[in-house]
UniProtKB/Swiss-Prot annotation:
GO terms for biological process: proton motive force-driven plasma membrane ATP synthesis. NCBIfam families: PRK02118.1, PRK04196.1. Disulfide bonds: none annotated. The keyword Transport applies. This is V-type ATP synthase beta chain. The keyword Glycoprotein does not apply. It comes from Treponema denticola (strain ATCC 35405 / DSM 14222 / CIP 103919 / JCM 8153 / KCTC 15104). Belongs to the ATPase alpha/beta chains family. It holds the Pfam family ATP-synt_ab. Produces ATP from ADP in the presence of a proton gradient across the membrane. The V-type beta chain is a regulatory subunit. One of its GO terms (molecular function) is proton-transporting ATP synthase activity, rotational mechanism. Keywords: ATP synthesis, Hydrogen ion transport, Ion transport, Transport.
Length: 431
């Protein structure tokens, strides 16, 4: 029989403290208030004093309310019925569908044993040239999208969700504005992609503690789908909101703050989520792509700074485009030698020419006279930005490579490209 405690020692915001024994860290409890029952989670143990984070917040909680410990950690339902559905950070439906209570699985478990993993060796096609051609997304990779506020990172995630060649999409939203939540819902529904998608959404108006549940729920469900043989892409936005929720709760708990007020375990908390990316030897895979906004466009901010040490590269979103010089996929060399024989050479030389174009723009802004070569670079840069960097471009990898050759042919002679003659002879457009 579960014990019921009817005396709350203290209430500090959404954190309550009770005296109890036989309780474990992370255990769920039910707090019965005059407004109804609310879940709470144990987040601190100090002798017989147990601190709990109340999901619905501390408003309406009084010291005489009952607290009943449930003897289990937070769980989420797993089945094919998740697809096409939308849930909040407590696992309850946000849509008009029924609550799912069968086949409950724990969240926040350990990452997969390395002996069960295989090396990343397959690409995920997205139809976005700046990803497929220049910074290939690889199965089981963990990548952040570094972005400033105001950049179209949610639009980019929605496009990837619609176009990525995977079996299942798990979309996790943390601190979303309600308009952004509706954008994801409506966009995926209209594109017919919601049927292969499960959404777990925490909006800015929801309790803070639910924000911390979103990544764990997404990754727990994704891992189960992967074990069942599915290739799963987990899309998370925004990990900075997740870190800010950690910071808020740490302050309430009076933890000693670290860099800019974030808790000292920020790195390990982020790593615990990203390390769930996996490619099983005899099953499916989990790939993680997560937006990390940079306050003030500051890449040294603790959240993007710590993230960079965990992940396998990054996409850097700037001025509405994936910036080629700030972006990097450290695993692309595992797959871009298997796509087409011109992939690597074309990728390297197009970026090299684009760097020369940027230098030419700087010379032009300083009033230098433009040479014939400079004029070619200016023409090339404009075509490269509109044909390759524009995020509205949606073409398969092979068509993107052909477009790359077409752009080169319109701006340069064969000899000026710097690409091996055998590749030029094979792929140079006829006219």
């Amino acid at each position: 029989m579960k014990k019921v405690y009817s005396k709350i020692e203290s209430i500090n915001g959404s954190v309550i403290t009770v005296k109890a024994d036989g309780v474990s860290y992370g255990e769920l409890a039910e707090v019965q208030t005059r407004f109804g029952a609310s879940l709470a989670e144990v987040n601190k143990l100090e002798g017989d004093l147990v601190s709990l984070q109340v999901f619905a917040g501390g408003r309406g909680v009084s010291t005489g309310d009952e607290v009943r410990f449930l003897g289990k950690e937070m769980q989420v339902s797993y089945s094919e019925d998740l697809l096409g559905r939308i849930f909040n950070g407590s696992g309850d439906p946000r849509d008009s569908g029924p609550a799912l209570k069968d086949n409950m699985i724990p969240i926040g478990g350990p990452s997969v044993n390395p002996s069960k993993r295989i090396l990343a060796n397959r690409m995920i096609r997205t139809g976005i040239p700046m990803i497929d051609v220049f910074n290939t997304l690889v199965v089981s990779q963990k990548l952040p999208i570094f972005s400033s506020s105001g950049e179209p990172y949610n639009e980019l995630l929605a496009r990837i969700a619609m176009q990525a060649e995977v079996d299942v999409i798990i979309l996790g939203g943390m601190g979303l504005k309600y308009d952004d939540y509706l954008y994801f819902k409506d966009t995926l529904e209209e594109a017919g992609a919601l049927s292969r998608t499960a959404m777990f959404v925490h909006t800015a108006a929801d309790p803070t503690v639910e924000c911390l549940m979103i990544p764990d729920m997404c990754l727990a469900v994704a891992e189960k789908f992967a074990i069942a043989g599915k290739n799963v892409l987990v899309l998370l936005t925004d990990m900075t909101n997740f870190a800010d929720a950690m910071k808020e709760i740490a302050i309430i708990q009076e933890q000693v703050p670290s860099n800019r007020g974030y808790p000292g375990d920020l790195y390990s908390q982020l790593a615990a989520r990203y390390e769930k990316a996996v490619d099983f030897a005899d099953a499916g895979s989990v790939t993680v792509l997560a937006v990390t906004t940079m306050p003030g466009d500051d890449v040294t901010h603790p959240v993007p700074d710590n993230t960079g040490y965990i992940t396998e590269g990054q996409f850097y979103l700037k001025n509405g485009r994936i910036e080629p010089f700030g972006s990097l996929s450290r695993l692309k060399q595992n797959v871009n030698g298997k796509t087409r024989d011109d992939h690597r050479a074309l990728m390297d030389n197009m970026i090299k020419l684009y760097a020369s174009y940027k230098d030419t723009l700087e010379k032009k802004s300083m009033g230098f006279m433009m040479s014939e070569w400079d004029e070619k670079l200016l023409k090339y840069g404009a075509k490269f930005e509109s044909g390759m960097m524009d995020l509205s471009v949606n073409i398969p990898l092979e068509d993107a490579l052909n477009l790359g050759w077409k752009i080169l042919a319109e701006c340069f002679t064969r000899e000026e490209t710097g690409i091996k003659s055998e590749l030029v002879n094979k792929y140079w457009p006829a006219n």
